[in-house]
Amino acid sequence: KVAKANGIEVASKTPTTPIWKAFAKNQFLVLVTSIFLLLASAYFVYGYLMQVGVDQEYAPIQPIHFSHKIHAGDNEINCKYCHSAARVSKNAGIPSLNVCMNCHKSVSEVAETTATPEYSKEFYDEQIQKLYTAVGWDSETQSYTGKSQPVKWVRIHNLPDFVYFNHSQHVTVAGIECQTCHGPVEGYEVQKQFAPLTMGWCIDCHRKTDVKMEGNAYYAKIHEELSKKYGVDKLTAAQMGGLECGKCHY
């Protein structure tokens, strides 16, 4: 109005199209963007779903603190002394408290040198007392009281119901070390899940692991026949049928 009053001619503004309208009118750009968003969404959803049930590094607090470092590391107790079922059965099993008492009838406290900055001698001694309470053991009279309490251990390694895994096949027949799947247990103060235990992880191991035939005439015969078939000097678990669906799923 001021410009008109002074006789000044003002150029009219050219109307511009909003960016979102211009984008909406460009069908090619809309198509490309939609495809990109769909693919990106599928990628992130797939990544999320693939992690469901994967509990790598899971280290729950147990009702009785059990140090694998002290038992398997410092005292060099063989894994299969406590997990004896791993030699002959599908499951490694949680050792019964009677197995613990094989030693702890005599060992009622730890040495002074066992203490660490994180865990005191008193703490470890308290865990042994928890064991005595659970089994109903009177350390003074060196006898059982008959009053026991179940220990509700928190499971760490938990495969889906549709997965079959046989410990004896791996430990006894294949001669696989426990640390291959469970990590350097002898150094763990708190037990955790070392490996992802996914299908891809198992298959990768089967493809890379050579079959041990020493002392196994059955495997030696199969190895002789299959090595000729595949034209290789050494067979992997995969070439021995380790990738067949029915071996792990039923």
Task: Give the predicted meaning of each segment.
Residues 47-63:
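Ser/Thr/Pro/Gly-rich low-complexity linker/stalk segments immediately outside membranes or between
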Residues 27-46:
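Hydrophobic membrane-insertion alpha-helices, especially the h-region
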